[in-house]
């Protein structure tokens, strides 16, 4: 499934791009950088007026109560996907916040821009980056994430971490 990133500075440019793409695209990603440019209004318009699906890439990370409240508020926009950092306590809070909605919580395991030196500087445990990513993916899924965001390098191996389907 194709998800097009609306990495533009404001709602007008986002609507213009979505208009040019028309029916060829049914799913859009709106990131943190677009938030102050009318990102939530853009999400609302694309969803309500044009029937598009929305992936809000916020990578939320805070104390549980704050994440839960933020997700509860964002769920009112009838979003399809929302990213949070994959720490289990963050994922659990997000799952609580989305309760009773169709919003899917996607966990970000490790930012793709980070390398081993960055992880060391941030006191992230030693080890192979791919193995840590898989471990974090498994923990996020156990904590209630609906899915995991991974780099192409980890995506194939992350498929091993899928939640078991209820029989």
List the model feature ranges, each with a label.
Residues 26, 51-52, 79, 145:
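Short phosphate-binding/catalytic loops that engage adenosine nucleotides
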Residues 4, 28, 59, 82, ...:
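Conserved, mostly hydrophobic/aromatic
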Residues 1, 47-58, 101-107, 163-167:
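Short beta-strand/loop segments at the ligand-binding rim of alpha/beta enzyme cores
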Residues 1-7, 54-58, 118-125:
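Glycine-rich phosphate-binding "P-loop"
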Residues 6-50, 64-70, 134, 152, ...:
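Conserved alpha/beta-domain cores
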Residues 62, 66-166:
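Conserved anion-binding
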């Amino acid at each position: 499934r194709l998800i097009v990133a609306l990495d533009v500075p404001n709602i007008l440019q986002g609507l213009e791009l979505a208009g040019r793409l028309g029916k060829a695209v049914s799913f859009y990603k709106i990131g943190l950088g677009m938030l102050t440019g009318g990102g939530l209004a853009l999400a609302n318009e694309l969803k309500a007026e044009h029937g598009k699906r929305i992936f809000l890439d916020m990578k939320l990370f805070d104390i549980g109560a704050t994440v839960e409240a933020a997700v509860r508020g964002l769920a009112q926009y009838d979003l399809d996907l929302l990213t949070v950092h994959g720490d289990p306590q963050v994922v659990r809070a997000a799952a609580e916040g989305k309760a009773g909605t169709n919003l899917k919580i996607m966990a970000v395991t490790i930012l793709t821009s980070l390398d081993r030196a960055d992880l060391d500087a941030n006191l992230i445990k030693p080890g192979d980056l791919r193995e840590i990513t898989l471990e974090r993916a498994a923990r996020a899924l156990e904590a209630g994430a609906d899915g995991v965001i991974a780099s192409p390098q980890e995506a194939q191996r992350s498929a091993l971490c899928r939640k078991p389907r209820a029989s």
